[in-house]
Design a protein with these regions (language model features):
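Glycine-rich loop(s) and the adjacent beta-strand/alpha-helix scaffold that form part
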Residues: 1-19
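Rossmann-like NAD(P)H-binding beta-loop-alpha module
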Residues: 14, 20-38
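Residue-level recognition of phosphate/Mg2+-coordinating polar/acidic sites
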Residues: 26, 35-181
Length: 183
């Protein structure tokens, strides 16, 4: 009987490696009100959770089949996080362009954009330090922060699996074509 290898589905994904600081501080933290997109798909709004070595949660599970396919084909998949989906890129840049006076950049991001905690941590973890000096680059990063995922979590951690007996090996009544009478 034809069988496809089992693969995790509705699962979390590992990143190439969080820094120890980020992992220690934010593992288990929910990332709320965020959008995520693969390059070829529209973004989805929701939330996910930072894990010690990656990400998981409903927003990740919704794209898990597409992410898994990208990893299988290319060895990695890059998703883009919109940390402020309720604001346009122009609105974000306008708020970043406001004078911050003696406030630190962290306080400016918090007071102008409400960007703090795990979302601010993601921005620092996944961005080159140079973008923080340029409001246009910073606004682009906030609206499309690249996160590279390198592998699915193991089968025993997945909510469900893909693979097994393919539909083309069965009749419309779900009987195995090679073994008549076996459903």
């Amino acid at each position: 009987v034809q069988c496809e290898p089992l693969q995790p589905s509705n699962c979390g994904f590992s990143v190439a490696g969080w820094s120890p600081w980020f992992s220690d501080k934010f593992a288990g933290a929910p990332v709320k009100s965020t959008a995520i997109a693969l390059a070829q798909q529209d973004g989805r709004l929701g939330e996910f959770v930072i894990t010690r070595d990656g990400v998981e949660g409903s927003l990740i599970y919704a794209l898990s089949a597409s992410i898994r396919e990208q990893i299988n084909q290319h060895g990695a998949a890059t998703v883009y996080l919109d940390l402020l989906p309720q604001k346009t890129a122009a609105q974000v840049q306008a708020l970043l362009n406001k004078p911050r006076g003696s406030k630190s950049l962290s306080n400016h991001l918090r007071s102008q954009l409400g960007l703090e905690g795990v979302r601010a941590g993601l921005l620092r973890e996944l961005s080159d330090a140079a973008i923080f000096a340029d409001p246009a680059l910073l606004a682009r990063a906030i609206k499309a922060l690249p996160l590279t995922l390198v592998q699915t979590r193991p089968l025993d951690e997945a909510i469900s699996t893909a693979g097994g007996v393919p539909f083309e090996a069965m009749t419309s009544e779900l009987m195995l074509k090679q073994l008549p009478g076996v459903f």
